[in-house]
Amino acid sequence: MGTTRVCSEVSSGSSKSLSQSLTVSTSTTETVNGFHEFKICGYSLAKGVGVGKYVASDTFMVGGYSWAIYFYPDGKSPEDNSSYVSLFIALASEGADVRALFELTLVDQSGNGKHKVHSHFGRALDSGPYTLKYRGSMWGYKRFFRRSSLESSDYLKENSLLVRCRVGVVKSVTEGPRYYNIPVPVSNLGQQLGNLLESGKGCDVVFQVDGETFNAHKLVLATRSPVFNAQLFGPLGDRNTKCITIEDMEAPIFKVLLHFIYWDELPDMQELIGTDSTLASTLVAQHLLAAADRYALERLKAICESKLCEGVAINTVATTLALAEQHHCLQLKAVCLKFVALPENLKAVMQTDGFDYLKESCPSLLTELLQYVARLSEHSVIVSGHRKEIFADGCDASGRRVKPRLH
């Protein structure tokens, strides 16, 4: 990190004139840091794929750029094949002269904390950040670890390795003088509408839900939900309606729905369901997603999708997948398909009650799932090495400059 002050004299003259014309700006250079963990399962099966062939992590974002970790079980270059494994970080998105610091850590899985760390961060003052010139440029080590030592070490556990990566992208910002600053309070519109709901003032419609009643305001409902707008003020609606019965929804779910309509945020879910159980939270999110789709509350639907994505698990993924299909949640559906199709998950998911429900409610998804499993098998993360070897400086083995692409 570094800070540079630049002072400029706008005019010359007396000392009084000089003091009045002096302006100051500050340039701050710092790193935007990010971390990624990459677990390599089935190490013994990855061996023997050939020199220059690698196992690739999923891409991850740091500092506005996409990155990936490449592990070469048989070495990156022919001269390293017999003795070493290779490990690199690659720029996976378009970018010119991306300056960054890197750190690669092979985690000691015995719990003793004796990790193998190769870090560029500690050497930054000596050599400065490393510059990646274009997509596919790499930083790392051809001779990261001697293979014989690795295979008899605590870094290899249950035939798997764990790599932790740290990337620090260098960013510079220049700021000029600030002559004034007037703080602006954050919006409290949601709180005001929520207080209106809780007070009961002006309520003009009552909902009957699963034996419970809820008061609300027609204009607020119609403003927030196109479905309520059509029901209350549309050509087929009844503007004089005073009571509406909601079928096929539990009262706690409708209460959360109503809270979101007024507050534009979810209540404390742990307080609502009385537990911090992940399973209970997932079930509530599933019901709430269906309710959000029913009343066209797109932001609430997206929030539920996000929570279900974060909590995807063996015992709930099948029902979540069915829900995503029924309510047209394409991103959530893709996440669930990817999770179920993983070899270590597929058998366990098929033994759940949720999978039986999936087969009954969405039989067409089984075909999609089989196709997804087949695609994963065809496009293994172990990439065939029929392309030329590309080095960090952007040259191939013959020394000609190339523009590498990641696949």
Curated annotation (Swiss-Prot):
SMART domains reported for this sequence: BTB, MATH
GO molecular function: identical protein binding
A GO biological-process term: response to osmotic stress
Inducing or repressing factors: By drought.
Disulfide topology: none
Keyword Nucleus part of the UniProt annotation: yes
Location of the BTB domain: 203-270
Annotated pathway: Protein modification; protein ubiquitination
Localisation per UniProt entry: Nucleus
Tissue expression notes: Ubiquitous.
Domain called MATH: residue spans: 33-167
InterPro entries: BACK_BPM_SPOP, BPM1-6, BPM_C, BTB/POZ_dom, MATH/TRAF_dom, SKP1/BTB/POZ_sf, TRAF-like
GO (cellular component) term, any one: nucleus
Keyword list, A-Z: Nucleus, Ubl conjugation pathway
CDD domains (UniProt xref): BACK_AtBPM-like (cd14736), BTB_POZ_BPM_plant (cd18280), MATH (cd00121)
Pfam families listed in its UniProt record: BACK_BPM_SPOP (PF24570), BTB (PF00651), MATH_2 (PF22486)
Subunit organization: Homodimer or heterodimer with BPM3, BPM5 and BPM6. Interacts with CUL3A and CUL3B. Interacts with RAP2-4 and RAP2-13. Binds to MYB56 at the promoter of FLOWERING LOCUS T (FT).
UniProt family annotation: Belongs to the Tdpoz family.
Summary of the function given for this chain in its UniProt record: May act as a substrate-specific adapter of an E3 ubiquitin-protein ligase complex (CUL3-RBX1-BTB) which mediates the ubiquitination and subsequent proteasomal degradation of target proteins.
Free-text domain note: The BTB/POZ domain mediates the interaction with some component of ubiquitin ligase complexes.
Name of the protein in question: BTB/POZ and MATH domain-containing protein 1
Organism encoding this protein: Arabidopsis thaliana
